[in-house]
Amino acid sequence: MKILSIQSAVAYGHVGNSAAVFPLQRIGVEVLPVYTVNFSNHTGYGAWRGPLIAPDEVREVITGIEERRVLGSIDAVLSGYQGSEGIGDVIVDAVARVKAADPHAVYACDPVMGNAASGCFVAPAIPDLLRDRVVPVADLITPNQFELGYLTGSTPDTLESTLASVEAARAMGPSTVLVTSVERPDRPEGTIEMLAVDDTGAWIVQTPRLPMKANGSGDVTAALFTAHYVRTGEAETALRKTVSSVYDLLASTLESGERELRLVESQEFYANPREQFAVSRVG
């Protein structure tokens, strides 16, 4: 399997491609990483150095890949945080090129905008760009509950309303939706859930909620779910494997006391997920 991953990169730490590439490689995926920024570290530190890559330069890299005549062998395109409107246009164009070479290729979009605690933290033009131009060409999206609400103009705060919001998102274009953080009032205290929906049904999985903030965990989640889903075609299987790997990665990081994900040290959790959490069908 080959995945073209168009995301940010950092020298220190693990976000964007610096979070997604190694777990994908560890489960046997050939990754073609294209960088949209090249920073010293992620912006959560409050200070960083390094360049934003101009959209035209990102496009040039993709054109160079196209000239190697490999776009027809790409199984999926993966994108995450989009720092500018121009990058969004480049990604949409890249998806069109890949699908022209292989109509069966999947575009997986992590529509990064913010979260319930922090609100929207991207440039003002990005949410509308994602909703109106990027998500409609995606086959798979991986929003959190907050992002799902923005995309669909809804308030998903129960299982029923979250499922309804997912169906509204699917009506926009993507057939498969992974909601990476579902919080509802009737869930047991100290837990959090993930929900996956495709044309065959809806599945939810519940895990303990770990007391931590982990930059890059959403990037790992989107990458692993995309690979497992493209490989198996089964949302239930992809959900079960992904949540196991990501939970164990986060638990290992929490135990270490380190701020950055223990991405390399946790590699066995990607290659051989324990699948310790039960997945339930809810639709």
Curated annotation (Swiss-Prot):
Species in which this protein is naturally found: Leifsonia xyli subsp. xyli (strain CTCB07)
MF term (GO), any: magnesium ion binding
HAMAP family (alphabetical): PdxY
Pathway: Cofactor metabolism; pyridoxal 5'-phosphate salvage; pyridoxal 5'-phosphate from pyridoxal: step 1/1
Keyword Signal included in the entry's annotation: no
One GO term of the biological process aspect: pyridoxal 5'-phosphate salvage
Listed name of the protein: Pyridoxal kinase PdxY
Residues that bind ATP: 110, 147
Function text: Pyridoxal kinase involved in the salvage pathway of pyridoxal 5'-phosphate (PLP). Catalyzes the phosphorylation of pyridoxal to PLP.
Subunit structure, interactors included: Homodimer.
Family to which this protein belongs: Belongs to the pyridoxine kinase family. PdxY subfamily.
Keywords, comma-separated and alphabetical: ATP-binding, Kinase, Magnesium, Nucleotide-binding, Transferase
